[in-house]
């Protein structure tokens, strides 16, 4: 604007605009900084900082790929359903059941075969499911007795090679497998059993302190009350040493050894000890007239060919 002296003075109208921009920048910066601090503070309490690991152990998954190399492409694998899709995806091989078919009657019989102490029964169940499947189960389900008789006396032989594929996750899932497989189809009800992993802070030749219990290895007693029937040392899926305590009944301690170190201690009852899963997968004990071991990748997995041909 002009003054009375004919001179002009500089305009100050742009100063408020500059100040407004500056204040706006300060507000935005403060907002973003505050949000950043907020998310940093809560990240430890939420899933933001959580990076999930693989759902299948990489060591176990590597054995899927090895199985693919060792069996004919037209083979079928009897295993637990949880990894059915993953196994088929990795190997191209068929499985007896998977996440889409775990509610079928096959699942009951597979579970029954795994927890059975009779390797003949697992052999018969596998043969029946491979040749008759759910259709045969439905046709013979006129009574519980008739169905069990049909499954235990299969008439046909499988055309394609059949394999049993045990995987380490089945140890942790044994309780669920046992709950299904022990179902009494005549009277109803089941008696689930499982593996109890013991956390030990002392192991000597004479005693063990595990999960708050004192285990006397001379007398074969837990807390001087519960009897132990045997103790088994396992390395690479084979029995390294077995010690009997002289009790007619009792629990079994299974100690898994890697190198010279005890890496896992399991407490199980007699039915779990005698189960096909425990005997074949963990102890490496199997009927050579019925099964042939094809691949031992213990502690991750183990593969057996069922001798039908």
Question: Language-model segments: which ranges?
Answer:
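Compositionally biased, intrinsically disordered low-complexity segments enriched in Pro/Arg/Gln/His
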Residues: 14-21
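Extracytoplasmic
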Residues: 4-11, 23-309
């Amino acid at each position: 604007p002009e003054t009375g002296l004919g001179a002009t003075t500089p305009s100050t109208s742009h100063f408020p605009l500059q100040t407004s921009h500056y204040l706006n920048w300060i507000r935005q910066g403060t907002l973003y900084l505050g949000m950043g601090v907020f998310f940093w503070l809560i990240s430890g309490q939420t899933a933001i900082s959580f990076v999930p690991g693989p759902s299948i152990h990489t060591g176990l998954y590597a054995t899927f790929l090895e199985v693919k190399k060792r069996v004919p492409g037209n083979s079928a694998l009897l295993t637990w359903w949880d990894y059915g899709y993953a196994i088929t995806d990795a190997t191209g091989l068929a499985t007896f059941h998977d996440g889409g078919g775990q509610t079928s009657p096959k699942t009951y019989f597979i579970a029954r075969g795994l927890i059975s102490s009779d390797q003949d029964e697992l052999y018969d169940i596998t043969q029946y499911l491979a040749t008759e499947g759910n259709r045969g189960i439905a046709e013979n389900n006129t009574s519980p007795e008739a169905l069990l008789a049909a499954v235990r006396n299969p008439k046909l032989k499988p055309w394609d090679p059949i394999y049993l594929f045990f995987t380490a996750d089945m140890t942790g899932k044994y309780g669920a497998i046992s709950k299904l497989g022990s179902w009494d189809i005549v009277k109803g009800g089941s008696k689930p059993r499982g593996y109890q992993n013991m956390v030990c802070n002392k192991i000597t030749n004479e005693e063990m302190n595990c999960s708050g219990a004192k285990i006397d290895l001379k007398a074969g007693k837990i807390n001087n009350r519960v009897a132990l029937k045997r103790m088994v040392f396992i390395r690479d899926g084979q029995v390294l040493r077995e010690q009997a305590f002289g009790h007619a009944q009792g629990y079994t301690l299974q100690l898994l050894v890697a190198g010279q170190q005890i890496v896992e201690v399991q407490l199980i009852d007699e039915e779990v000890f005698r189960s096909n899963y425990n005997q074949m997968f963990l102890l490496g004990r199997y009927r050579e007239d019925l099964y042939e071991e094809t691949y031992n990748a213990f502690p991750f997995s183990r593969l057996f060919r069922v001798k039908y041909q």
